[in-house]
Amino acid sequence: MIARKRKSNGSETTSGKIPKDDVSSESCLDQPADESVHEVVTFEPSTLPSVHYDPDTTEPISCSLKSLDELLSWKRNEASIFNVSSVPLASRYPPLESCPRRTLVSHDMMGGYLEDRFIQGAEVETPYAFYHWEYIDIFNYFSHQMVTIPPAVWTNAAHRHGVLSIGTFITEWTDGAKTCEAFLADEESYRAAADKLVQISHCNGFDGWLINIENELSETAVNNTGPFLRYLTDQMHERVPGSVVIWYDSVLKDGKLLWQNELNDNNRMFFDACDGFFTNYNWTEQSLEGMKSYAAAQGRFADIYVGVDVFARGKVIGGKYETNKALELIRKYDLSTAIFAPDWVYECHEKADFRQNQDKFWSLLSDFLYIHRPSSNLPFVSSFCQGFGKSLYWRGKVETERSWFNLHAQEIQPLYLSESFGNGGWLRTRGCSEDAWIGGSSLMLEGMIPSGLSDVCARIFSLHVPLAARTFVSFVFKPPVGVKVSLELKTIDGPLCTFDGTEEIASRSVFPEALAESNQLVEQFAQNCGQWASDGWATRCFLLKMIGCSLREVCIRVSRDGGDEDINFNCRIGEIMLLDADNLQAPLQSVEGICVNDVVWQTGVLKGDGHTLKVLLNATLRWQYPTRQVRHFRIHWRHLRGPDPRIPSGPLTLIGRSYSALYRVVELEVPAAPGLIELVVEPVSKEGFSVPEAQWGRQTLSYSQSPSGNPSH
């Protein structure tokens, strides 16, 4: 994940689990791994498909499909092996089907496929990222290309938080009308198009489609639109359980293009054929009243997503920093909402103030949004990384010193809240990239404890995690001056864990006491981690003994350390981790089956001697390893032997990080041919425990000059 800087030119060009039924000729995981791979260095142009690999660097990229021909000719064995979600959809409370008022976010930003198209990350000073996942149910990646396939970085981030990720199928203008006349001509045609949409969603690991037909339809086409939607919806449900198909308010039952800004008799046929209806943005309170009393909507209010354009284009209610006014009205009528283009906080403001503006925007909406609880078994781990930063950290040390952006790296996000108390007291949590424990950011907890108040408490996680009989807790932070910091955990008993999540349940607070550093569990944990503290970071460990309980909230309590005057504080939180205390040494598997393919050799700029060109290696590494056991993989390389036998073997050097069992080595400078290098894959466990080198994966690559002796061309 060591990123390269890319221009935001808006060009489109499709991250990565490998489907079980993938029979692509690129796959070599089922073949015996050679002890060494040999390559002949030839500087020929790359033959990799430019829609999936950057033509200049061969970096893997995400892309859309621009035409009906591209859709109908799509084949699984020609699809990108990188643009595939590697994170399964997490459970959460309340489940989507139980949530009476849902929130969809439609991400429409400057045409789409910007820095986020680089699947292994990009070097970006001030990127846009979404991290208020606790508030939303569905994430839609939107562009004006015909078939918008969500970049896997977004799907992974959404899935990690239990949020659905859906793509967009859109037709517009004259060309769109021609497309519709073709694929809606008859049953065979619309089924062929729907089948491809289902296959693409299944292959890439996302969860459905927004269907947006913004052109007029002939009588034949509109009569086939309902059956098309119904067939697509049924097939999606069968192939991708939990998926959704949502219709955008556009054409009417007679084929005319006339936005209604509500669900009514003119567009009901489309609503009846799929999972939801996304209204246009120019609605009024009268529109909401009408939908609330509309017979066809009864029992399906949650499936009506009232559109809100954050840019406030046209005659709309709310928008911008008054979007909360629109949500207040929508929730008054018990309807769901679709928030369109919340990247307004990024596009229309100073990029350096992005975090502050995004937190302000979602804070204003928070009274009208559910907080969803991601649900998982132990271990639960978060370092608060938002998927970007000024440097890349590992255990408080800078691993890569440059700006980067990669949503694959985003971890479970905390609640970003702001509260005020009497006498001027306040409390806020925010992400901060100035320092981090792991990843690119830490959680800043800051505020003022006013005179007369002994402490303040910040809720940083709402979740649902069944605890072990003995649960080990690790808490990494930088101790602040003048105040004391402690953990408060809220739990519920096991019998209460079967509810559907829509009602509040009384919890009890647990205030664990820190274990001594001499405690056997603490010593074992420290030994597994390989490093105890760094650059002012402190680690506190706790042991919970609770049978049949689940964790519901993680809170941090800040109390004054003597005195009664107003006291300002700021505390940096690096990581919170909960583990089964009886499995602190769970054995990890070895990386197996490393293979190297799709090798491309390039020449770089002249070296310092003025006449020798740099030799650059580009190659895809694939291996076998259960990715659910790891936080990420570190990819290393070292020089073993070159043309000059007097030069000894080199040390291992980090190339980057991978978040799946797949990595593209890009522009790696290696010694001139003939040479021998070693490529190494190091698994990093979710807990951050050190993995013995004997379990790392290794593959040697030898290379020689072409027989002509001229490696240039």
UniProtKB/Swiss-Prot annotation:
Q: Which UniProt keywords apply?
A: Cytoplasm, Glycosidase, Hydrolase
EC number(s) per entry? 3.2.1.96
Pfam families assigned to the protein according to its UniProt record, in alphabetical order: Glyco_hydro_85
- Which Gene Ontology CC terms are recorded? cytosol
Location within or outside the cell = Cytoplasm, Cytosol
Which reaction equation describes what this protein catalyses? Answer: an N(4)-(oligosaccharide-(1->3)-[oligosaccharide-(1->6)]-beta-D-Man-(1->4)-beta-D-GlcNAc-(1->4)-alpha-D-GlcNAc)-L-asparaginyl-[protein] + H2O = an oligosaccharide-(1->3)-[oligosaccharide-(1->6)]-beta-D-Man-(1->4)-D-GlcNAc + N(4)-(N-acetyl-beta-D-glucosaminyl)-L-asparaginyl-[protein]
Q: Which domain of life is it from?
A: Eukaryota
Q: Name one GO molecular function term.
A: mannosyl-glycoprotein endo-beta-N-acetylglucosaminidase activity
Which ranges carry the BRCT domain? Answer: 270-362
User: Which residues lie within the region annotated Disordered?
Assistant: 1-36
- The answer to whether UniProt assigns keyword Cytoplasm to this entry is yes
Q: Which Gene3D superfamilies match?
A: Galactose-binding domain-like (2.60.120.260), Glycosidases (3.20.20.80)
UniProt-listed GO biological process terms: N-glycan processing
Major enzyme class: hydrolase
Known role: Endoglycosidase that releases N-glycans from glycoproteins by cleaving the beta-1,4-glycosidic bond in the N,N'-diacetylchitobiose core. Involved in the processing of free oligosaccharides in the cytosol.
Q: Record's family?
A: Belongs to the glycosyl hydrolase 85 family.
Q: What is this protein called?
A: Cytosolic endo-beta-N-acetylglucosaminidase
Q: Which organism is it from?
A: Danio rerio
Upper classification of the organism: Eukaryota, Metazoa, Chordata, Craniata, Vertebrata
Its gene name is: engase
